[in-house]
Amino acid sequence: MRVCDVVSNSVWYDPRVRKQIVEYMNNNVDVVCVGLKDHRYDEEKMKNVPCPVTLADIDEKYKKPLSKVEVLFKEFNRVKKLREAILSQKPDIIHANDLDTLTAACQAAKKLDCKVVYDSHEICVENHQMRGIYKKLNALCEKTFIKRINKMVCVSHAAADYFENKYAIEKPMVITNCSLKAEKTASNDKHDGFEILNHGVYYGGRGYDIIVESAALLKDYPEIKIALRGFGAMEDELRKRAEEIGNENVIFYPPVLVNELIPYASKSKVGVAITENTCLNFELSVSNKIFEYASAGLPVIMSDIPEHRYLNEKYNFGIILKENTPECFKEAAIKLYTDKEFYDVCAKNADRLSEEVNWETEFSRLIEIERSWVNG
């Protein structure tokens, strides 16, 4: 069975695609990858991608500020380049990652008479960054080509319901962005105090400002420490606000490599996974951090969106915030700090979540279906 894994970036920094490649290879699947040479292309890091990779390159004239008409021509050029790269691989199955690869994948599949898996990492047309003619074009592409695929995959049950209802298709298979079994880490070497961690890229809608503000409300609990690990556009603003509050229990840790996130998280006591539903895409998503914290054995304080509720009702591994406010966060932090029995139950259940929901188990379900297509 030959699978062509298709993505519209330079592959090496896309964690979901890299996990796909590794799991295909672990299951003795002949996997090749097709991508696009983008601004993050790194020749040295490409050597770490464990399968053959073909990177298409869009024409130079489209690598500059473009008019609306030129944007359309750039899209046609991008689809053409991806399609040609896929055709050169002659796969049995095309695994199209996200909407921006779907058109090329379906066009190539028609010529090759092969199967297509559409793996939607998000609800692209409902992303707050998708606007104007670009949004209309993508909505048209999804509506047209989603009827031509053989299987759809998405990252949450809430998103699966959305796609099923919107396009009247078979309910997509849910394969969450969970962690690898091998990444599971438990640590008795905890940081001082009761440390509550939010790690990732510092940008709006992810709760970093909320937890920093909560520090002002937690001064009567000096053992509770608010920790942030990462980088991003909000860092200066967050540091400034922490200084204004004057609470020394707000800690900023430097960023670490992706494969170090879980071991470092295991040194904290609680994880934070806040997604503010500023658009439908965010509302129907699931925070990858939940699975990272669970793999580190941490209870989680999380926002009230459908998939977080679904997971917590099933596994009872943390607290769903009533509202995304410093006041509600303070209540959750104090509950986990003062109620040791509740904390221990949540920690045990987080461990169970990571045991039952891991990448190897999740992705093997798709590989089984793909084998049935090829083997008849």
Regions found by a protein language model. Give the residues of each.
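Conserved acidic donor-binding segment of nucleotide-sugar-dependent glycosyltransferases
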Residues: 314-315, 319-326, 335-340
